[in-house]
Amino acid sequence: EIEKQDTIGLFGEDNIMLTDLILRMESNDLNNCSLVKSSPLVFRESPDESEIENYLNAGICPAGRVIRVVESYQNLDTRIQSGFDFSLYYSAINSFGNFNFSLNITKLEKFKQKAGNDFIRLIEAQENGIIPKELAISGFSDLLEKDGSPKIQANLKLIWNKGSWGLGLFGQHIGEFYETRNKLSDGSLWNVKAYNTISGYIDYRLNLNSNNSRIRLGIKNITDERAPLASDIFGYYFDKHDNLGRHYYLDLSYKF
């Protein structure tokens, strides 16, 4: 188990927006909207006439649409992680050729982030009814299988060659997790499903002018697996998943 104090990380755009909402609601005064406070990290455009009318009818000082949220790294208090890594390697040389096999599995069993002062302020505001219960506060408490932190990840690799021929096979598994920023109508969290891909290649080595050369034909994502749907910026977690689908490549190499 690893415990890190004063971990560095991002507070999160959603949480910054909630902080901005709290400041606006706590300082809301229709008699003098110029005194309303807001987060310096949230930039808005000027509200139009219809937006101003809607805000005033709701008893809230007008605010324009958000055009930019600035994030910076900060201390996020204590983080606790525990789990294990499993690795298996095997190689063999026989009449069928040379074989190399590897399997790596990572299992995360605990991943917790203690709430620092910024998170505590959001929690207290929600408990006091300043912000709705339906708005999720993310980035603290139990983070296991939440927002891009799957419990299990695995990679497999098999390489074979004999004479001039070679073959490679690769597998990847990224376990499921849940998005805390999205809730279904029944209150449950949005499930980002597990992601599995298989890729491979076949190549042939040849001698051209006494130099080693190689021609390789490969297929990435043989099963045409698509990234599971999520509310991240590209519609999926680009740092975890790939949405290119099946694609082929031809690689020619020549050593001078």
Residue ranges of model-derived segments:
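Hydrophobic, lipid-facing positions within transmembrane beta-strands of outer-membrane proteins
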Residues: 82-86, 152-156, 196-202, 246-252
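C-terminal beta-signal and adjacent terminal beta-strands/loops
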Residues: 109-112, 168-181, 204-256
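Generic long, charged, amphipathic alpha-helical segments
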Residues: 171, 180-197
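Short, surface-exposed, polar/charged, turn-prone segments marking secondary-structure boundaries
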Residues: 23-26, 116, 128-134, 187, ...
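A cross-taxa feature marking solvent-exposed loop/turn segments within ectodomains of secreted
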Residues: 94-96, 193, 208-210
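Gram-negative outer-membrane beta-barrel transporters
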Residues: 4-5, 9-181
